[in-house]
C-alpha cells in the first residue's frame, strides 16, 4: 500500500495541497510582475487576504484599477468542468476569477481562464447553480453552500498567458 501511495502522482497534491496552493500563488505573481516589467510598468501592488471570508484570495492594483481576485486551479486534462465561486466576490469592486490549468508534475501554467468584467466593473452574474459541499454529512447528503455558485468552464474566457491576463485585469 505504501509503495502504491509513493507512485501515485496525485498523492502530494492531496497531502500537500496548501503548499501547492502557495506555490501557484507565488508563481502567478511572479509571472504577472515579470510581464508588467517587460511592459516597462512597475506599478503593481499585491495584497494577500489572511482570512478566507470575503470571496477573494488576493487584491491587485495597477493603472488605478483595484481587483479582488479569486484564484482557482486544476490539472491540465482533468475532468474538472466547474469551480465554486463565493457570492461575496460580487460585493467587491472589479471582482474576478482566474482559473489556471497547471501541469500536474511541474505546476507550470498551461492555460489561463478569465471570468470578470472590464476594469472598474463589478463581477458578472454568477448564475443560480448553488454549490454543494464536496463531502457528505453523516447520512451521505451533500448540503448546499448557499453563498457559493458553481461556475462552468464555458463561462470563462481562455487567455494566451500573463500578458493577456494583465490586459483583462488592468486594461
Protein language model annotation of sequence segments:
Residues 1-54, 59-171:
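Mixed-charge (Asp/Glu-Lys/Arg
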Amino acid at each position: 500500500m505504501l509503495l502504491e501511495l509513493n507512485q501515485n502522482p496525485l498523492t502530494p497534491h492531496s497531502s500537500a495541497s496548501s503548499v501547492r496552493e502557495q506555490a501557484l500563488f507565488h508563481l502567478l505573481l511572479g509571472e504577472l510582475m515579470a510581464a508588467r516589467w517587460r511592459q516597462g510598468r512597475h506599478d503593481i501592488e499585491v495584497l494577500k487576504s489572511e482570512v478566507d471570508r470575503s470571496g477573494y484570495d488576493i487584491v491587485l492594483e495597477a493603472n488605478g484599477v483595484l481587483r479582488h481576485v479569486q484564484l482557482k486551479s486544476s490539472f491540465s486534462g482533468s475532468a474538472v468542468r466547474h469551480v465554486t465561486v463565493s457570492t461575496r466576490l460580487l460585493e467587491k469592486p472589479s471582482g474576478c476569477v482566474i482559473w489556471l490549468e497547471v501541469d500536474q508534475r511541474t505546476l507550470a501554467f498551461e492555460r489561463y481562464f478569465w471570468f470578470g468584467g472590464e476594469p472598474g466593473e463589478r463581477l458578472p452574474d454568477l448564475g443560480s447553480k448553488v454549490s454543494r459541499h464536496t463531502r457528505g454529512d453523516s447520512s451521505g447528503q451533500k448540503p448546499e453552500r448557499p453563498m457559493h455558485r458553481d461556475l462552468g468552464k464555458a463561462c470563462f474566457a481562455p487567455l494566451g498567458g500573463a500578458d493577456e491576463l494583465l490586459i483583462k485585469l488592468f486594461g
